[in-house]
Curated annotation (Swiss-Prot):
Keywords: Cytokine, Cytoplasm, Inflammatory response, Lysosome, Mitogen, Pyrogen, Secreted. InterPro entries: IL-1_CS, IL-1_fam, IL-1_propep, IL1/FGF. PANTHER family: INTERLEUKIN-1 BETA (PTHR10078:SF30), INTERLEUKIN-1 FAMILY MEMBER (PTHR10078). The gene is IL1B. One of its GO terms (molecular function) is protein domain specific binding. Monomer. In its precursor form, weakly interacts with full-length MEFV; the mature cytokine does not interact at all. Interacts with integrins ITGAV:ITGBV and ITGA5:ITGB1; integrin-binding is required for IL1B signaling. Interacts with cargo receptor TMED10; the interaction is direct and is required for the secretion of IL1B mature form. Interacts with HSP90AB1; the interaction facilitates cargo translocation into the ERGIC. Interacts with HSP90B1; the interaction facilitates cargo translocation into the ERGIC. Its main location: cytoplasm. It is found in: Cytoplasm, Cytosol; Secreted; Lysosome; Secreted, Extracellular exosome. It comes from Cavia porcellus. This is Interleukin-1 beta. The lineage of its organism: Eukaryota, Metazoa, Chordata, Craniata, Vertebrata.
């Protein structure tokens, strides 16, 4: 057992040489208090000490006196008048922590959320009412349709992806519903071109699409334009002529860049 240090002057004020306890010589299993010539002292509320005038080891006597003194001191402490809450620490936080902006320059695809990318199914036709149809495995053309031919028009799955946003501009990706094909913009022979690109259906669409797949959907009154995010000022366009391929134009000449968008049920 560790030795009990000598009591300080502050503690000895609560110490009395009369505060002695007695143990039987048979050992601790038969420990009891001896009340020969005993006095009953009430030191404080909840603390009562029975004193015996028997000879006993001084160190143990000091230990008992120390316990009594600590109890008396504890009762002299003023009780807390309010419950300690998280708000009590708030004024200290600025001295402990320093706010720094979180800047994320890169994105790790492995840590992206597996939440489905928001999307809408829609059809497009230009302001001359030409519809977009899939004429070859990887080519869109614009032509007038009517009656039963309307079911030839392609249905787009328009996904809302990461990119620059404003009041009238929304970054989207345009995939063909039911097919692993997406419109993309690439450079060929020194000129931006529009193409249908085949993708892995298990990986696409995703929230952060490669920039060649992203179009800025710009709303103007009742029409929309689709500007390439990869090549600013280049738009999905149709020709004035019938049955011509959909292409990427820079709004020069007679190219049509204004479309009507119609939402369709899933």
């Amino acid at each position: 057992m560790a030795a009990v240090p000598e009591l300080s002057s502050e503690v000895t004020a609560y110490h009395s040489d009369e505060n002695e306890l007695f143990f039987e010589v048979d050992g601790p299993n038969k420990m009891q208090y001896c009340f020969q010539d005993r006095d009953l002292c009430s030191l404080d509320e909840g603390i009562k000490l029975q004193i015996s005038h028997q000879h006993f080891n001084k160190s143990f006597r000091q230990t008992v006196s120390l316990i009594v003194a600590v109890e008396k001191l504890r009762k002299k402490l003023a009780p807390c008048t309010w419950a300690f809450q998280d708000d009590d620490l708030r004024p200290l936080l600025p001295f402990i922590f320093e706010e720094e902006p979180i800047v994320c320059d890169t994105w790790d695809e492995e840590y992206e959320s597996d939440t489905p990318v928001p999307s809408r199914n829609c059809t497009l036709h230009d302001i001359q009412h030409k519809r977009l149809v899939l004429s070859d495995p990887c080519e869109l053309k614009a032509l007038h349709l009517n009656g039963d031919n309307l079911n030839r028009q392609v249905v787009f799955s328009m996904s809302f992806v990461q990119g620059e946003r404003s009041d009238n501009k929304m970054p989207v990706a345009l995939g063909l519903k039911g097919k692993n094909l997406y419109l993309s913009c690439v450079m060929k022979d020194g000129k931006p071109v529009l193409q249908l690109e085949s993708v892995d259906g298990k990986q696409y669409p995703k929230k952060k699409m490669e920039k060649r797949f992203v179009f800025n959907k710009i709303t103007s009154k009742s029409t929309v334009e689709f500007e390439s995010a990869q090549f600013p000022n280049w738009y999905i366009s149709t020709s004035q002529a019938e049955h011509k391929p959909v292409f990427l134009g820079n709004n020069n000449g007679q190219d049509i860049i204004d479309f009507k968008l119609e939402l369709v049920s899933s």
